Amino acid sequence: MNDQVIIFDTTLRDGEQALSASLTVKEKLQIAYALERLGVDVIEAGFPVSSPGDFESVQTIARNIKNSRVCALSRAVEKDIDAAAEALKVAEAFRIHTFISTSTIHVQDKLRRSYDDVVEMGVRAVKHARKYTDDVEFSCEDAGRTPIDNLCRMVEAAINAGARTINIPDTVGYTVPSEFGGIIQTLFNRVPNIDKAIISVHCHDDLGMSVANSIAAVQAGARQVEGTINGIGERAGNCSLEEIAMIIKTRQELLGVRTGINHEEIHRTSKLVSQLCNMPIQANKAIVGANAFSHSSGIHQDGMLKNKNTYEIMTPESIGLKNQALNLTSRSGRAAVKSHMDAMGYKEDEYNLDALYQDFLKLADRKGQVFDYDLEALMHFSNLREEDDYYKLNYLSVQSGSVMATTSIKLLCGDEEKCEAAVGNGPVDALYQCIYRLTGYDIVLDKFDLTAKGEGEDGLGQADIIANYKGRKYHGTGISTDIVEASGQALLHVINSIHRADEIAEMKQKKIATV
């Protein structure tokens, strides 16, 4: 049996479903580039029929990603499959992933069909997808709770119809490893044409079993594992791909399989997904948590000093977590900044060096020494900004005491600079009152978070907000050594996104009116 395990990432599809606010096309493309660097075999970029935004995201990713196969999801419905193919056709090669529910509860209560109808729908969907590509994946939704006879029948029929990958999801995270591995083993034993397809698994983490179930499936013969970076996803999340990759690498002698993952990209990819998705990583998270390589016990520290292997089964360097290099200061030139970015593995086309250097100089003037983690934070924030931002903060002054705070700002609105001052319950409240008055947007703030992005009193602070405007949620981010300024940047990030969305909607209306 082939010893290569295909890694199928669904961060941009299943993972995004867990987010408070949808990612922009630009943010999704950033993540797709990171997944490509990581060595992911298949990137599930979205569900094109679900919305124009998802269609555009899939199309953009399919156009730009060259070293990973781009995939789109569709129900077992012809219009879904047509939309997926239309979005993907800009790629040299692509995959269509179609699915239908197979468990008794789903068939009877959700689909309200007979099982014969479900099999026929699945077969029809696979055949229709094959008109567009030979690379068709078929999923039996809720396979973990599907009667085994029905599951075997569906798998055999889908393979006969032309599916080259059969995905067995534990959709509600119900099974345990021995049980799930047994399902995969039974398929290999009972489905006569099983050798004509790759068996894939897609496990959810409702009972904390997703990674263990996936490894059990690999031991039983599955050769594709689906999951997400940091395990993000519906409800309790998905199988964590960085954990799968490091388990296979660390226990290769036991498992006898391998992946094509570039393990030294794990840490960087994890941080990027956490940053853009506004989902902090728990400190004790396996592989990528802040405490993953920490040793506080005296006994453990003694052992580590004598021989690292006493308590360390893998190294921080193996996932790309490197020691801090020499610090940068305001006297450091562009070449020094570029050298640090090169050392961290970033390519020139992943960031704008001129913009990053200007942000670096401002930060260096404020805090003196700038560290690699500061540069990364500045780069991520710089990449989020748009060149055509309509609203820009030109000046900020805060007076705060024991009673009320006063904030004065100058805001560039297009080509016009406007001034405003306000009193509020704290400097951030006063600043937000100023911005609301000058922009005129009626925004409801759902969530406000402040996070330290560096170390020490002069470290960078990141503000993240979730805002609601006309029923749609927006995520805004700001970063600065001044948390009030960071908070203002976050709100302006949201307002600029709303402004762009309004402009696009207005242009569409004008086009419709002229037809």
From Swiss-Prot:
It catalyses: 3-methyl-2-oxobutanoate + acetyl-CoA + H2O = (2S)-2-isopropylmalate + CoA + H(+). Its EC number is 2.3.3.13. Residues 392-515 are annotated as: Regulatory domain. The gene is leuA. This is 2-isopropylmalate synthase. Catalyzes the condensation of the acetyl group of acetyl-CoA with 3-methyl-2-oxobutanoate (2-ketoisovalerate) to form 3-carboxy-3-hydroxy-4-methylpentanoate (2-isopropylmalate). Mn(2+) binds at D14, H202, H204, N238. The lineage of its organism: Bacteria, Pseudomonadati, Pseudomonadota, Gammaproteobacteria, Vibrionales. PROSITE patterns: AIPM_HOMOCIT_SYNTH_1, AIPM_HOMOCIT_SYNTH_2, PYR_CT. Belongs to the alpha-IPM synthase/homocitrate synthase family. LeuA type 1 subfamily. HAMAP family: LeuA_type1 (MF_01025).
